[in-house]
Amino acid sequence: DWLTIDICDEGDDDRLFRLIADADVLWHVLQPATAEVIAAAPKLRLIQKIGVGVNTINLEAARARNITVCNMPGTNSQAVAEATVMLMLSALRRGMAFHDATRRGDGWCMDPSVFDQIGEILGRTVGLIGYGEVARRTAPVVAALGARVLYTATAPKDDAVGEWRDLKSLLVESDVISLH
């Protein structure tokens, strides 16, 4: 009886405001923890973001009430890095065009206008804009596949996989650009 966990679906504002009135902790996923939500929670002591960013939490309202805000940095970096590489490969290999053709029953078209545009990451230059945790995990994977890696960040990183460039140079030199 010392712990009660209530679940509220995203977008169910009526239930949210009913529950938040007696909540000590808000486990926050996507629905914004606005100043209005925080004001409706007189007992609230902690907002725990189940994820990385806190951009959906009104930090000023939480700070004004001395409510602690926590997040989970790095928890999805590997998954996002893997998805980044998958999307690069899919774009280069024209994955969606072949997927759509297969779903229509057309099979794999050997039409040169489609087939000749298929590329590999080998020999390409991949530019990473930003060099946080996701880019740090993406860089060695694309390098292992044979890509040249460039990155831009506020300053060159000693432990980076790849070569630092200013943004303009990175955009000019890169075949594939990934925002991080």
Predicted regions mapped to residue ranges:
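Positions that flank functional sites
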Residues: 13, 35, 77-78, 157
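Rossmann-like dinucleotide/phosphate-binding beta-alpha-beta segment
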Residues: 112-180
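Phosphate-binding beta-alpha-beta segment of Rossmann-like dinucleotide-binding domains, i.e.
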Residues: 65-67, 73-125
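Short loop/edge segments at beta-strand edges and connector loops
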Residues: 7-9, 73, 153, 166
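Short, charged, surface-exposed secondary-structure boundary motifs
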Residues: 56-60, 79-83, 159-162
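An N-terminal-biased, well-structured beta-alpha scaffold segment characteristic
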Residues: 1-69, 172, 179
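Short, acidic/turn-prone active-site loops that include or flank metal/cofactor-
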Residues: 51-54, 74-77, 155, 170
